[in-house]
Each structure stands twice: as C-alpha cells, then as structure tokens.
C-alpha cells in the first residue's frame, strides 16, 4: 500500500507479492455449437480477436497473474475500463464489491483456499460487458479450470 502514497487516484499500481511476470492471456470464444480456446495470446492478438468478435458468441478473457501492471492497464484501456477499476483490479487487498457502470459491471471477489493448515485468499476481478467476460486473477493455478472444462463439453448447459 505504501507504494501508492502520493499518487493520483486511478494509478495502475500492483500491490501484491507475486513476482512480476508477463500475464498469461487465455481467450475462450464459444456459442452453443463451437468453442475456441487460445492460450498465451499477446496484447496485439487480443486486440485483433476483440475487433473481429461477433455478437453471436461469448468472449471470455482470463488473465493471470496481474503483477505486470502496465499490461493490465493496456487491457483495461482496450476494453474502455475506468482507471479506478484498473486500480482496484491491481489492489489485491481491496475488499470484495460489485459496481455497476453504464457499459459494464465490475466485481471483486476473494477466493479462499485451505491447504496445509493455512487459509489463503486470492484476489479475483471480473468485468461483465455485453457478451464479454474478463477475469483477472492474482495467483495461479487457475481457479476457473473446472468451469472451462465444463464449457468444452458440447452438450454443456453452460453454453
């Protein structure tokens, strides 16, 4: 938190303790008939995919970890997210909340996990915008893996 002292509100500063590394961007584009999963997309590929998206499909972008604040800010800019939303995504100690904006809904949740006698929490942010879901997680492993596996099944009710 001390790294944010004196900065303007909306500054994209990561407050967690995960080592800074390039985020892994995974895109999942699906409808009732088809699903396409792309691993390790670059920001340029993400922009290209976003520009060619049609309204008949759902577009899920999952990003982790969020330690590379500049890349997260660029993704926020691509999807026209308010700078305060990007700041909250990067503030891993932020309390859970839900906020409704004109163009999207922003949600911060904490994922609790008990392992080896220790309770730990992961910071997860979600943005729901039209047919797009953006999910940002502070730590790996992927907390959404079971959901993704269910989406891959052709007869899944989730589609």
How should these model regions be labeled?
Residues 1-159:
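Peripheral, non-transmembrane regulatory/ligand-interaction domains of membrane transport proteins
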